[in-house]
């Protein structure tokens, strides 16, 4: 009889768990939502125009916005994180379009320099093969249930890696704050022959009472189907400091 009463109590937190919120203007997040569901995380997808006025009740808010980021949405995201929320910023939520949102970029602690890529200027390439490299082998987000299927040389070290055959890469993100680096990127520009190795493909940082995280890969949505990458994003959603 004790077991019969205990079972509902153990299951109750799972049944009562609130969905995470995905704010998006792109189809690729549908694949992410499926992957989160497969990992036991329910999600609700909205546009920035239809998002709830208050975000405080969500255990995590994921942002995937390619186009213009409205002032109202920007403020809501920043307030949510600073008030104790977990804001997960994906792919082109940091891109040249977001230069129009200096408050957003300052909050993230990222700048996108002008100028030629060879001189440190921001540039994107698409579609290209990209290697994501584990730079945090002791961090829970980068390791918990993550089965890395590849290895790559990175700054003279052999590291766990994810090989993405066709995605979009952003070069020369400049990080200006106390970012905890999770993922690096390795990309070979076939035209110039230059190999770029940068510690900018995944990170997180404190945002007053909460957290903000960023993961670069996700242009087509197929990236979210990679088992290791899907698990990393699941870990980000489930992260408890």
Question: Which functions belong to the PLM regions below?
Answer:
Residues 3-13:
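Sec-dependent N-terminal signal peptides
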Residues 31-39, 122-208, 214:
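Catalytic beta-strand/loop cores that center a nucleophilic Ser/Cys/Thr
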Residues 17-23, 28, 34, 106-108, ...:
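Extracellular ligand-binding/catalytic regions of CAZymes and related secreted enzymes
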Residues 8, 65, 219:
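Residues that line or immediately flank small-molecule/substrate-binding pockets and catalytic motifs
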Residues 68-151:
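A glycine-rich, often tryptophan-bearing local segment used as a flexible ligand/cofactor-contacting loop or short
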Residues 62, 88, 182, 213-215:
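Hydrophobic/aromatic beta-strand patches that form the interior of the parallel beta-sheet core
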Residues 18-102, 224:
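Helical hinge/lid and interdomain linker segments adjacent to catalytic or ligand-binding clefts
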């Amino acid at each position: 009889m004790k077991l019969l009463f205990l079972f509902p109590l153990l299951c109750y937190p799972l049944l009562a768990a609130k969905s995470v919120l995905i704010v998006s203007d792109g189809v690729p997040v549908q694949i992410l939502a499926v992957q989160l569901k497969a990992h036991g995380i329910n999600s609700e997808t909205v546009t920035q125009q239809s998002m709830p006025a208050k975000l405080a009740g969500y255990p995590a808010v994921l942002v995937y916005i390619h186009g213009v980021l409205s002032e109202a949405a920007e403020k809501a995201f920043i307030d949510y994180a600073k008030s104790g929320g977990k804001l997960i910023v994906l792919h082109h939520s940091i891109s040249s379009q977001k230069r129009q949102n200096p408050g957003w970029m300052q909050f993230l602690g990222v700048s996108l320099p002008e100028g030629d890529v060879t001189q440190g200027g921001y540039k994107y390439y698409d579609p290209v093969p990209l290697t994501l490299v584990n730079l945090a082998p002791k961090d829970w987000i980068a390791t918990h249930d993550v089965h890395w299927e590849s290895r790559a040389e990175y700054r003279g070290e052999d590291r766990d890696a994810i090989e993405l055959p066709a995605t979009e890469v952003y070069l020369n993100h400049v990080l200006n704050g106390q970012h905890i680096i999770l993922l690096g990127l390795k990309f070979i520009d076939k035209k110039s022959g230059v190999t770029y190795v940068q510690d900018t493909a995944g990170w997180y940082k404190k945002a007053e009472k909460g957290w903000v995280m960023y993961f670069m890969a996700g242009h087509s949505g197929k990236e979210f189907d990679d088992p290791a990458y899907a698990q990393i994003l699941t870990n980000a959603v489930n992260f408890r400091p």
